[in-house]
């Protein structure tokens, strides 16, 4: 373990390798967790409303079973075809059996996980909190892509993330105090909850989902309430830019719904990495102005 402390490049390399390997599992989480949730909802509906004769699901699906397979020909993926990034490149982005194209997003998620984990290790160095922040980063990646795909932010991700942030503050592993962590979680939830109900009162429409409240609560628990204004501002700016671009490219009306969770996740991660620098720059800009 001393080698990791004295050779930072080794620590960064191992963190990147860990991110690469876990990134492969994140692809499974991103694809399967919404389907698992749907199966659970169907089962609950069938049990709660027997008068509607809802057929309960017969399929069994977990994050580990059954084995991953090609969505087109359903051939199980071989072990040598499951190496992050490299297998996709070796197969030229196609299934080895039916030659159906495999989405480039799979290696992208793996490479992104490796890159961001390496950045976290580089930024925070060899410390217990770094391991936690790597986990924090990986959960944000999974939540981002699930929200992009389904407009859902699963409680299975946001709630454990919130309680982990508070637990780290309680154990004094996190630099955030317990008081700031708890208040950050409460303020994060109530902030978007208030915006949601105000928007609904004024327009009669729902502007965001409850998953967004819980994700901001998790970010507040990890970073403290002081960073919430920055996260909200950054996520709003990024969301506005990408929303306008998407509206222009897809030529859809302003009524089109956009997931807000990815922008919260991006803003939260940026605040984690460079929040102090951004805050200093902003204050210096105000003083200089």
UniProtKB/Swiss-Prot annotation:
What's noted on cofactor binding? Zinc is required for the N-terminal methylation of the mature pilin, but not for signal peptide cleavage.
Q: Tell me which GO cellular component terms the UniProt record holds.
A: plasma membrane
Q: Which UniProt keywords apply?
A: Cell inner membrane, Cell membrane, Hydrolase, Membrane, Metal-binding, Methyltransferase, Multifunctional enzyme, Protease, S-adenosyl-L-methionine, Transferase, Transmembrane, Transmembrane helix, Zinc
Which InterPro entries does this chain map to? Peptidase_A24A_bac, Prepilin_IV_endopep_pep, Prepilin_pept_A24_N, Prepilin_peptidase/N-MTase
What coarse category fits the chief subcellular location reported for this protein? membrane
Q: Name one Pfam family in it.
A: Peptidase_A24
Q: Which reaction does it catalyse?
A: Typically cleaves a -Gly-|-Phe- bond to release an N-terminal, basic peptide of 5-8 residues from type IV prepilin, and then N-methylates the new N-terminal amino group, the methyl donor being S-adenosyl-L-methionine
What's the cofactor?
Zn(2+)
**Compartments where located:** Cell inner membrane
Question: Transmembrane residues, as ranges?
Answer: 10-30, 102-122, 126-146, 182-202, 227-247, 254-274
Membrane topology category: Multi-pass membrane protein
- Name one process (GO BP) from the record: methylation
Known EC number: 3.4.23.43, 2.1.1.-
| Description of the deletion phenotype | Deletion mutants are unable to secrete several extracellular degradative enzymes including the cytolysin/hemolysin tthat remains in the periplasmic space. It results also in significant decreases in host cell cytotoxicity, adherence and virulence in a mouse mode.
Q: Where does Zn(2+) bind?
A: 70, 73, 95, 98
Recorded superkingdom: Bacteria
- What is a single molecular function from GO for this protein? methyltransferase activity
* Stated role: Plays an essential role in type IV pili and type II pseudopili formation by proteolytically removing the leader sequence from substrate proteins and subsequently monomethylating the alpha-amino group of the newly exposed N-terminal phenylalanine.
- Family affiliation: Belongs to the peptidase A24 family.
In Swiss-Prot or TrEMBL terms, this protein is called: Prepilin leader peptidase/N-methyltransferase
Gene name of the record: vvpD
